[in-house]
Regions:
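Conserved AdoMet/S-adenosylmethionine-binding subsite of the radical SAM
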Residues: 2-130, 136-137
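A structural motif corresponding to the C-terminal lobe/cap of the Radical SAM core domain
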Residues: 120, 136-161
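Radical SAM enzyme core and accessory elements
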Residues: 164-169
Length: 169
Protein backbone atom coordinates (compact mmCIF):
# COMPACT_ATOMS: atom_id res chain seq x y z
CA UNK A 1 0.00 0.00 0.00
CA UNK A 2 1.50 3.30 -1.08
CA UNK A 3 0.24 6.58 0.35
CA UNK A 4 1.23 9.79 -1.39
CA UNK A 5 -0.12 13.31 -1.44
CA UNK A 6 -0.52 16.17 -1.26
CA UNK A 7 1.73 15.48 1.69
CA UNK A 8 0.85 12.36 3.72
CA UNK A 9 2.82 13.61 6.73
CA UNK A 10 0.13 16.28 7.13
CA UNK A 11 -2.29 13.39 7.80
CA UNK A 12 0.21 11.25 9.72
CA UNK A 13 -2.29 9.94 12.29
CA UNK A 14 -4.65 8.67 9.60
CA UNK A 15 -1.82 7.16 7.52
CA UNK A 16 -0.37 5.49 10.63
CA UNK A 17 -3.73 3.89 11.42
CA UNK A 18 -4.07 2.74 7.80
CA UNK A 19 -0.55 1.31 7.80
CA UNK A 20 -1.21 -0.47 11.12
CA UNK A 21 -4.19 -2.21 9.50
CA UNK A 22 -2.04 -3.08 6.49
CA UNK A 23 0.67 -4.55 8.69
CA UNK A 24 -1.91 -6.74 10.50
CA UNK A 25 -2.86 -8.15 7.09
CA UNK A 26 0.75 -8.60 5.98
CA UNK A 27 0.55 -5.78 3.43
CA UNK A 28 3.77 -3.91 2.61
CA UNK A 29 3.57 -0.16 3.35
CA UNK A 30 5.19 2.65 1.38
CA UNK A 31 5.19 6.36 2.18
CA UNK A 32 5.69 8.85 -0.68
CA UNK A 33 6.69 12.12 0.99
CA UNK A 34 8.65 15.34 0.69
CA UNK A 35 10.03 14.73 4.18
CA UNK A 36 9.51 18.38 5.13
CA UNK A 37 7.52 17.54 8.28
CA UNK A 38 9.01 16.04 11.42
CA UNK A 39 7.03 15.70 14.63
CA UNK A 40 5.80 12.98 17.01
CA UNK A 41 3.06 11.92 14.57
CA UNK A 42 5.54 11.53 11.72
CA UNK A 43 7.84 9.59 14.02
CA UNK A 44 5.02 7.19 14.94
CA UNK A 45 4.16 6.74 11.26
CA UNK A 46 7.71 5.64 10.46
CA UNK A 47 7.24 2.84 12.98
CA UNK A 48 4.84 1.13 10.54
CA UNK A 49 6.50 2.17 7.26
CA UNK A 50 8.38 -0.44 5.21
CA UNK A 51 9.55 1.79 2.36
CA UNK A 52 9.90 5.54 1.96
CA UNK A 53 9.87 7.21 -1.44
CA UNK A 54 11.56 10.47 -0.48
CA UNK A 55 11.17 13.36 -2.91
CA UNK A 56 14.60 14.93 -2.58
CA UNK A 57 13.79 17.90 -4.78
CA UNK A 58 17.08 19.82 -4.77
CA UNK A 59 20.63 19.20 -3.60
CA UNK A 60 21.49 22.79 -2.62
CA UNK A 61 19.89 24.46 0.39
CA UNK A 62 19.27 27.80 -1.31
CA UNK A 63 17.51 26.10 -4.25
CA UNK A 64 15.41 23.97 -1.91
CA UNK A 65 14.09 26.99 -0.08
CA UNK A 66 13.65 29.08 -3.23
CA UNK A 67 11.73 26.49 -5.25
CA UNK A 68 9.85 24.55 -2.57
CA UNK A 69 9.54 26.86 0.43
CA UNK A 70 10.92 24.01 2.54
CA UNK A 71 14.21 24.04 4.41
CA UNK A 72 16.52 21.34 3.00
CA UNK A 73 17.76 20.75 6.55
CA UNK A 74 14.28 19.42 7.41
CA UNK A 75 14.46 16.90 4.56
CA UNK A 76 17.98 15.91 5.56
CA UNK A 77 16.79 15.42 9.15
CA UNK A 78 13.95 13.21 7.88
CA UNK A 79 16.46 11.17 5.84
CA UNK A 80 18.59 10.74 8.96
CA UNK A 81 15.54 9.38 10.79
CA UNK A 82 15.02 6.88 7.96
CA UNK A 83 18.68 5.91 8.24
CA UNK A 84 18.47 5.51 12.02
CA UNK A 85 15.44 3.23 11.65
CA UNK A 86 16.94 1.38 8.66
CA UNK A 87 13.83 2.00 6.55
CA UNK A 88 14.40 1.15 2.89
CA UNK A 89 14.39 4.43 0.98
CA UNK A 90 14.24 5.49 -2.64
CA UNK A 91 15.51 9.00 -3.31
CA UNK A 92 13.48 10.55 -6.09
CA UNK A 93 14.19 13.80 -7.87
CA UNK A 94 12.17 15.50 -10.57
CA UNK A 95 14.60 16.93 -13.12
CA UNK A 96 13.58 20.46 -14.13
CA UNK A 97 15.36 22.13 -17.04
CA UNK A 98 17.46 25.09 -16.02
CA UNK A 99 17.07 24.33 -12.31
CA UNK A 100 18.54 20.95 -11.37
CA UNK A 101 19.38 19.36 -14.71
CA UNK A 102 23.16 19.34 -14.38
CA UNK A 103 25.62 16.48 -13.88
CA UNK A 104 26.87 18.23 -10.73
CA UNK A 105 23.37 18.21 -9.25
CA UNK A 106 23.00 14.49 -9.99
CA UNK A 107 26.44 13.81 -8.52
CA UNK A 108 25.39 15.59 -5.32
CA UNK A 109 22.23 13.48 -5.21
CA UNK A 110 24.33 10.35 -5.66
CA UNK A 111 26.56 11.57 -2.82
CA UNK A 112 23.54 11.86 -0.53
CA UNK A 113 22.52 8.32 -1.48
CA UNK A 114 26.01 6.93 -0.95
CA UNK A 115 26.13 8.42 2.56
CA UNK A 116 22.95 6.58 3.61
CA UNK A 117 22.81 2.79 3.59
CA UNK A 118 19.02 2.95 3.82
CA UNK A 119 18.91 4.33 0.26
CA UNK A 120 18.33 1.39 -2.05
CA UNK A 121 17.50 3.28 -5.23
CA UNK A 122 17.79 6.71 -6.83
CA UNK A 123 15.20 7.73 -9.40
CA UNK A 124 15.43 10.70 -11.75
CA UNK A 125 11.92 11.65 -12.81
CA UNK A 126 10.75 13.75 -15.72
CA UNK A 127 9.24 17.17 -15.00
CA UNK A 128 5.67 17.11 -16.29
CA UNK A 129 2.93 19.73 -16.44
CA UNK A 130 0.02 17.47 -15.52
CA UNK A 131 -1.00 19.90 -12.77
CA UNK A 132 -1.58 22.89 -15.08
CA UNK A 133 -5.38 22.40 -15.31
CA UNK A 134 -5.61 22.51 -11.50
CA UNK A 135 -3.78 25.84 -11.46
CA UNK A 136 -6.03 27.16 -14.24
CA UNK A 137 -9.18 26.09 -12.37
CA UNK A 138 -7.94 27.98 -9.32
CA UNK A 139 -7.03 31.03 -11.40
CA UNK A 140 -3.39 30.73 -10.35
CA UNK A 141 -0.46 31.02 -12.73
CA UNK A 142 1.70 27.89 -12.75
CA UNK A 143 5.17 29.12 -11.66
CA UNK A 144 6.99 26.68 -13.96
CA UNK A 145 4.70 27.24 -16.95
CA UNK A 146 7.51 28.53 -19.17
CA UNK A 147 9.79 25.57 -18.49
CA UNK A 148 9.59 22.74 -21.03
CA UNK A 149 8.84 19.22 -19.85
CA UNK A 150 11.80 16.91 -19.37
CA UNK A 151 12.10 14.06 -21.88
CA UNK A 152 13.53 10.55 -21.63
CA UNK A 153 16.35 11.78 -23.85
CA UNK A 154 17.12 14.60 -21.40
CA UNK A 155 17.40 12.09 -18.55
CA UNK A 156 19.62 9.75 -20.61
CA UNK A 157 21.94 12.59 -21.62
CA UNK A 158 22.12 13.79 -18.03
CA UNK A 159 23.05 10.32 -16.81
CA UNK A 160 25.72 10.05 -19.51
CA UNK A 161 27.30 13.16 -18.01
CA UNK A 162 27.62 11.44 -14.65
CA UNK A 163 30.53 9.05 -14.25
CA UNK A 164 29.42 6.89 -11.34
CA UNK A 165 25.99 5.57 -12.33
CA UNK A 166 25.95 2.23 -10.52
CA UNK A 167 23.12 3.21 -8.10
CA UNK A 168 21.20 5.50 -10.42
CA UNK A 169 18.24 3.98 -12.28
Amino acid sequence: MTVSGGEPLMQADFVRELFELCKKEGIHTALDTSGCVWNERAEALLGVTDLCLLDYKMTRSEDYLRYTGCDKAAVDRFLEELQKRNIDTWLRQVIVKGINDTPDSVRRLYGVAAAHTCVKKVELLKFRKLCVPKYENLGIEFPFGNIPETTDKDIRELLEGVKNKDRIN
